[in-house]
Amino acid sequence: MKIFTALLSLALFLALTSVAFAAPADRVDLKRVTKSRAAVVDYWTAERMRNAIPAERAQGGSSSKAQRAAFSSYEYPGSYTTFPASTHGKVFFTLGGVNYVCSGTAVNSSNRSVVWTAGHCVNEGPGAYATNWAFVPAYRDGSRPFGTWTARTLVTSSAWANQGNISYDVAGAVMNTHGGSALTDVVGGRGIAFNYNRNQFFTSFGYPAAPPFTGQRLWVCESNLLTSDPTTSPQTMGIGCDMTGGSSGGGWVVGSSVYTVNSYGYSNQRNVMYGPYQGSVAQSVYNAASTR
């Protein structure tokens, strides 16, 4: 059984333990946000942010052979408010009346407003969309140096939203303007890559919040591609990483571009993080988010 780095529901478990689904012809699913920006900002008090919870961890093994992970892991040492660290941030949202945390990355787009994250950070997969969706770039110890940005549209793959297919666990959240400015005009934006060679050296970013981490600092893992998950189709990619719940949606960067996001792990594969391969379906999600 897989371990998610954010919300897990019974429906999610059922979806993940079933056979892999093909990506549907209608590749994109989205939800327009009706709650006002001011209402979402007011909702996310310092106390609610502090008490929002990270992953629920599933127990049990997997059908994948356990791997020995070789990787580096460390707290980001530089300034959070200087590009490119300023593009990484903490995500807050509500599902089923419970407040959760994820991670995300501001990426370049035509509307200058897209946060790239995991599908399960916007939708139960399958199930409801998140509410009160907010992104705090350069979050550190409760500080919000660039303010709280709220979503106007949440976009994910229909394979995730309708089937819970982990191979398509990606999403783009389109942000409202803040102080009259678009997101990447303020914090900058990473590039984003699709249909690439899998064999890369990845630098993964996130805000792990389950023990031994606190979710208050940006964390980094560095690893070559370690493995692929044969239980998924297309196969997801695995790297060495010890990040825990709350890091979901954090970007895996190669050069200056996001190649995938933190998605899940297995209980019998310690220190291995998986992320979807960003092919044409992920590109469709990005294109839809970029034009909203």
List each language-model region with its residue ranges.
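Protease-domain processing segments flanking chymotrypsin-fold serine proteases, especially trypsin-like
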Residues: 22-108
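Bacterial N-terminal signal peptides
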Residues: 8-17
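Catalytic nucleophile loop of clan PA
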Residues: 242-261
